[in-house]
Structure formats: structure tokens, C-alpha cells
């Protein structure tokens, strides 16, 4: 080992004492990825080392920070896992799940077109991951085989959330980004767009899986754009009847006519041989964070951590050595428990009572008898309803709805200011005996001086039907979600 290499190794050891650094897995213009072993658990991880000065010079600071923030929020078996982020003045160290195999792109290049059963297996996992993102109001915006990895068991891991963005209900994205061959018509046309762009990209990926080629391809990029905007492509004769039905519905130029994820889940081609764990949507992120497994806690205690410290850290979503160990042990157990059906054991136990996006949205009655639909990031099954809604729908009168809202805010000690006829700004300080009185588990919170600011707007969707929208303005996102849960309970929705 020369002097420079020894110096680099010593630097990594001092910054990352909990990891044994191994070989370089890859490198790029502003980062390199190292294989490492988490010493306490013995599990392998990948550590992405990002150079701050190079990131700044390339003008991608926002992209990098966006990906870090989004991946911290996501927990899904088919989305790459981020365990911790360690920052120094010169570098950012992102500890991530280690995926052994490679890109889906290379797999397609090597094998050519796949048999429909194999393509379906991969596509089902991709849709599950994308659905989870959309449920959490995240649009990937750059889905392509290069951004989909395969693990050692040929299971999907969606990566590269640098171009992703967080959607707010009632708002559309306008930034034109993503890879030309996979970009939706509304993106390349510069029109406002929503999560339907990911459906289009998934359609292109499905075409590539089944055909071994891209539907929209040309040496000349303007020609590619023209084909995309006109929806010009050819379906090979070898495709089955149901595959020939599904692909055109995903590659619909008009996004309002494009098939939704709910409809994809109901499609005969998708449903064929659908694994149990994929037939049940995973817990929402807020519920996942609250779910603490005793068996894993004990494993973490066995390697030297204090039990109360582990539980408190998990309950308050604190990143530290204990929580990193917990999630590494949990994820590796889930991946290895059922080799041919990853995470089945985890999802099987929550199958009863879970809100399934493939089922009709259930009506729930509030205290005053108004009927609300819990639409947390899910599309309705109503055929003519093509909007992406986050909120509560009601058929009550606006006056009655606002009266119930004011009662709920008062009970939760939330201050508000009226800024429009059916529009209010709210402010809540976490300093009251909130968790104890409003059924959120006591262990999930330590009272801290946290301020949450949000806006409530009542929209008229159609005659006699109204949508209540809640938009976070400022404050920690997870705590805001907790507050929303308490608010919904006050309204009688949960």
C-alpha cells in the first residue's frame, strides 16, 4: 500500500469507525462507491462517497440533497434502502443497501426480450415500488432500466431519486427532466404534469422487457420526441393478447386517458401469478416508522445496545448506531426469510385490515354524519375521476364541513387564521399533552419545541362534492403526518 492509499484508508477508518471498508464498486465524476461491512451486525453495505467541491462545481447540489432526503423517507422492498448519512466539510458518506447483481438495462441487453412470466415478475415489483412512491406523494421522473437494479435473487431495486420531486395536491410539476426515450409526452412538451409520467416510463420499461428494444428510438433526438408526442410505435406479433392491451393503455399520449396504477393492478396480465406480498400495499411510511419488532430489538440489544435507547431512537426516528443496526438486521432477515418471495413474512402479518389500493375506497362516517373517503395518496376507483388527490372527500355542505374542521383544530389546540372563505392557515406547537390524549402511542414521541405550519383548503370538486386539502408549509414532515392522523381521528375518519 502506497502512502496515498494508506492515508485514504486511515481517513475512512476515522470517519466511518462502524464499518470495515472494502473494495471500490464503482466511481463517477463526483462520487465513488465502496463495499463495506457493518462491524456490529456483519452485514454488507454500499457506501457512496460524494465530494462536495465536485458536486458544487457541477451544479448538482440540489439534486444530491433531494435524493438523500427522499431515500431517508422511503422504506419498501423494491426501493434501494438508505441507512445513514455522515457529513464532513469535504465529503458526504451515504450508507446504502448493497445490491450484488447489476442494472436491469444490462440484463435486458444480455438476454434480449424476456419471456412474459419473467417480465411480469420484474414489472410487478417495479409497479409496487412506484405505487409506494406515489402514495407518499413522490414522483420519480426518471424511471428507466439503468435506474433499476437487480439483487442476487433477481429482485428489483429502484434507485436514483435525484430527479424525483415531492408533489403537493393541487400542484403540478413543470421541470422538463429525465431520459428522452422514457420521457412522457407532457414532459417533453413542457406542459404541467403529475405522477402519470411515471406510468408512461413504466410502459416503456415493460415494452423493453417484452420486446428487447425501445418503443421510441431514433438516432435523431428530435425524431424521438416527435414519435413520443404522436405515440408512434409498433407492437410485435409475439406479444400475448393481454400484454398488447396493457402497453398501449400505459403509453397513452393524453395523460388523462392513461391507465392508473389502480387499474394496472386490476389488469389480467399484471394479476397473473401475483405474489401475495405484492398484492397487499405496504404500510404507509408513518406507520412503518412506528412499527417496532421485538425480535429485532432483542438482536440489537444482544450486540451491546441499551434497550431503552434503541426503542426511544426508533420511536423518534433518530439516526444513530442503534437504529442503523436495527434496520440492517430487519432488512436482511426479511430478504432471507422467503428467498422466492422477499418480504412476504413482513407483509403477510399486516394483510388483515390494510387499505388496499385495488379495492374500492371505503366510505367512513364522521361525527356529524358526513361521508368522507380516505384518499391518502391513492386514486379512486371511480372511472371518470382521473385526478391525483390527497385529502378527504365529502358530500356535506361547506358550512358543516368547516364547522367540523374548526372543532377538530380547537380540540388539538391548533391556532388558525382565516385567509379566504374556505382557506385557513394553521400553526401548532408540540408542547401540549398531545400524544397521550389523541391515541398516538406514547413511546412514539418525546415532547420537543417543534412548530408545524400548514394550510387547509376546501375545494369544490363537482356539484355537491368537496375535497379537503391539507398542505404542509413548515416543520418536520414525520411529525406533520402524526398531526394529520390526529386531525383525521378528530374528524372521525380514522
Swiss-Prot record:
The name this protein carries in UniProt is SNF1-related protein kinase catalytic subunit alpha KIN12
Segment PPI: which positions? 387-494
Taxonomic lineage per UniProt? Eukaryota, Viridiplantae, Streptophyta, Embryophyta, Tracheophyta
Q: Does the keyword Disulfide bond apply?
A: no
Which purpose does this protein serve, as stated in its record? Catalytic subunit of the probable trimeric SNF1-related protein kinase (SnRK) complex, a central regulator of cellular energy homeostasis, which, in response to seemingly unrelated darkness, sugar and stress conditions, activates energy-producing pathways and inhibits energy-consuming processes. May also be involved in the regulation of fatty acid synthesis by phosphorylation of acetyl-CoA carboxylase and in assimilation of nitrogen by phosphorylating nitrate reductase.
Record has Nucleotide-binding as a keyword: yes
For this protein, what post-translational modification is recorded in UniProt?
Answer: Autophosphorylated.
Which intervals of the chain are annotated as region Regulatory domain (RD)? 293-494
Q: How does it assemble?
A: Subunit of a probable heterotrimeric complex consisting of an alpha catalytic subunit, and a beta (KINB) and a gamma (KING or SNF4) non-catalytic regulatory subunits.
Instruction: Provide the residue span(s) of the region labelled Auto-inhibitory domain (AID).
Output: 289-386
Q: Where is the UBA domain?
A: 291-331
Kindly give the PROSITE patterns that the UniProt entry links to this protein. Answer: KA1 (PS50032), PROTEIN_KINASE_ATP (PS00107), PROTEIN_KINASE_DOM (PS50011), PROTEIN_KINASE_ST (PS00108), UBA (PS50030)
Q: Which UniProt keywords apply?
A: ATP-binding, Kinase, Nucleotide-binding, Phosphoprotein, Serine/threonine-protein kinase, Transferase
- Tissue specificity as recorded in UniProt: Expressed at very low levels.
Where on the tree of life does the source sit, at the highest rank? Answer: Eukaryota
Domain KA1, by residue range, is 445-493
Q: Which residues form the Protein kinase domain?
A: 19-270
Which Enzyme Commission number(s) are listed? 2.7.11.1
Regulation of activity is described as: Activated by phosphorylation at Thr-175.
Record remark on domains: The regulatory domain (RD) contains the auto-inhibitory domain (AID) that inhibits kinase activity of the protein kinase domain (KD).
Which positions in this protein are listed as binding ATP?
A: 25-33, 48
Amino acid at each position: 500500500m502506497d502512502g496515498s492509499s494508506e492515508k485514504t484508508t486511515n481517513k475512512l477508518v476515522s470517519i466511518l469507525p462502524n464499518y470495515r471498508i472494502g473494495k471500490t464498486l464503482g466511481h463517477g465524476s463526483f462520487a465513488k462507491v465502496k463495499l463495506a461491512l457493518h462491524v456490529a451486525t456483519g452485514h454488507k453495505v454500499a457506501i457512496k462517497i460524494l465530494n462536495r467541491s465536485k458536486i458544487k462545481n457541477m451544479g448538482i447540489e440540489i439534486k444530491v440533497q433531494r435524493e438523500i432526503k427522499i431515500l431517508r423517507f422511503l422504506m419498501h422492498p423494491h426501493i434501494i434502502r438508505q441507512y445513514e448519512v455522515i457529513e464532513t466539510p469535504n465529503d458526504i458518506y451515504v450508507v446504502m443497501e448493497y445490491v450484488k447483481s447489476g442494472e436491469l438495462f444490462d440484463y435486458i441487453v444480455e438476454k434480449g426480450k424476456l419471456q412474459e412470466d419473467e417480465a411480469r415478475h420484474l414489472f410487478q415489483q417495479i409497479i409496487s415500488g412506484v405505487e409506494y412512491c406515489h402514495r407518499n406523494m413522490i414522483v420519480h421522473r426518471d424511471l428507466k432500466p439503468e435506474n433499476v437494479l437487480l439483487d442476487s435473487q433477481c429482485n428489483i431495486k429502484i434507485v436514483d431519486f435525484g430527479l424525483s420531486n415531492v408533489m403537493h395536491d393541487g400542484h403540478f410539476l413543470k421541470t422538463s427532466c429525465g431520459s428522452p426515450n422514457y420521457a412522457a409526452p407532457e414532459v417533453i412538451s413542457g406542459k404541467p404534469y403529475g405522477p402519470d409520467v411515471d406510468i408512461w416510463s413504466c410502459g416503456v420499461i415493460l415494452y423493453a422487457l417484452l420486446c428487447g428494444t425501445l418503443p421510441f428510438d431514433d438516432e435523431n433526438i428530435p425524431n424521438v420526441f416527435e414519435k413520443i408526442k404522436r405515440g408512434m410505435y409498433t407492437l410485435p406479433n409475439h406479444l400475448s393478447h393481454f400484454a398488447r392491451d396493457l402497453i398501449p393503455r400505459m403509453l397513452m399520449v393524453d395523460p388523462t386517458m392513461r391507465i392508473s396504477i389502480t387499474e394496472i393492478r386490476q389488469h389480467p396480465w399484471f394479476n397473473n401469478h401475483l405474489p401475495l406480498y405484492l398484492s397487499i400495499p405496504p404500510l404507509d411510511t408513518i406507520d412503518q416508522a412506528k412499527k417496532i419488532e421485538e425480535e429485532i430489538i432483542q438482536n440489537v440489544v444482544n450486540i451491546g445496545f441499551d434497550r431503552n435507547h434503541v426503542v426511544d431512537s426508533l420511536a423518534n426516528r433518530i439516526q444513530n448506531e442503534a437504529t442503523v443496526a436495527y434496520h440492517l438486521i430487519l432488512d436482511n432477515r426479511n430478504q432471507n426469510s422467503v428467498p422466492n418471495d422477499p418480504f412476504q413474512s413482513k407483509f403477510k402479518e399486516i394483510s388483515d385490515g390494510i387499505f388496499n389500493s385495488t379495492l374500492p375506497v371505503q366510505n367512513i362516517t364522521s361525527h356529524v354524519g358526513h361521508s368522507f373517503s380516505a384518499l391518502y395518496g391513492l386514486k379512486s376507483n371511480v372511472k371518470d375521476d382521473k385526478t391525483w388527490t390527497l385529502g378527504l372527500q365529502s358530500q356535506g355542505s361547506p358550512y358543516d364541513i368547516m364547522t367540523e374542521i374548526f372543532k377538530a383544530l380547537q380540540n388539538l389546540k391548533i391556532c388558525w387564521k382565516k385567509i379566504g372563505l374556505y382557506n385557513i392557515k394553521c400553526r401548532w406547537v408540540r408542547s401540549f399533552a398531545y400524544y397521550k390524549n389523541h391515541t398516538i402511542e406514547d413511546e412514539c414521541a418525546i415532547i420537543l419545541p417543534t412548530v408545524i405550519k400548514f394550510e387547509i383548503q376546501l375545494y369544490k370538486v363537482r356539484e355537491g362534492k368537496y375535497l379537503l386539502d391539507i398542505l404542509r408549509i413548515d416543520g418536520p414532515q414525520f411529525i406533520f403526518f402524526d398531526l394529520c392522523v390526529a386531525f383525521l381521528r378528530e374528524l372521525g375518519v380514522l
